[in-house]
Amino acid sequence: MNLLGKMIYVEGFMMIMATLLVSMSYGHRAMINDVAEAPVFDDVVSPNGLDSSWYDARATFYGDIHGGETQQGACGYGDLFKQGYGLETAALSTALFNEGYTCGACYQIMCVNDPQWCLPGSVKITATNFCPPDYSKTEGVWCNPPQKHFDLSLPMFLKIAQYKAGVVPVKYRRISCARTGGVKFETKGNPYFLMILPYNVGGAGDIKLMQVKGDKTGWITMQKNWGQNWTTGVNLTGQGISFRVTTSDGVTKDFNNVMPNNWGFGQTFDGKINF
């Protein structure tokens, strides 16, 4: 073989090898993607300072296709449709509910590892209720500690799994709550037991600290009563009221002059801003 022939042969061989290497490299990347535990959703934002890793859990459903039995609940919310949560809700097991401190938090959930029953895609839900443990049973006790379980509304369950599945393995993670409008503050109680239910909370969604201030007082730390209801024994009737709210990711916002001095119990006030 002359010199020109050898050069052509070597160049051709190098081109073939380069093509093979690129093909192998692409194939390796594809294989990694195929075995990844969870996809990345570009439209999902993680809350500041909160763990947004994927974790294992189970999910089932309660209520009917219209959301019956999912209203009210252990978080203290009322009409979930009027309050902006709709059908995108779930009751959480003891391990996730955290004595009500998780109320209002948002999660992304998808069915995994069960090709017979799982459907593609995911749902985004708000924690609005508690799935109580049942210590009288030894089987089907998904909500007993230490198990992590989501009792979804039926419409949400049907987006990720077939009805006949009943219960399915899932992956879940915390996500930022996207809300429309300001945080709302609902008043309950009496002059010596003011109870406030904040709802429609964006960002982390769940509240770890709440303070209240009247026209004639400084900031008063409220006590979490049950669910997401916060209380104080200080009589603030006849005063304009402001709130200071800290969500579980450590973000604090002041909601100034939310309630006028002629406010009454059973009313709801718009905080105008959100997280």
Swiss-Prot record:
One of its GO terms (cellular component) is extracellular region. It is a peripheral membrane protein. It is found in: Secreted, Cell wall; Membrane. Its main location: secreted. Keywords: Cell wall, Cell wall biogenesis/degradation, Membrane, Secreted, Signal. It comes from the Eukaryota. One of its GO terms (biological process) is anatomical structure morphogenesis. Residues 1-27 form the signal peptide. Coiled coil: none annotated. Causes loosening and extension of plant cell walls by disrupting non-covalent bonding between cellulose microfibrils and matrix glucans. No enzymatic activity has been found. Belongs to the expansin family. Expansin A subfamily. This is Expansin-A23. The lineage of its organism: Eukaryota, Viridiplantae, Streptophyta, Embryophyta, Tracheophyta. The gene is EXPA23.
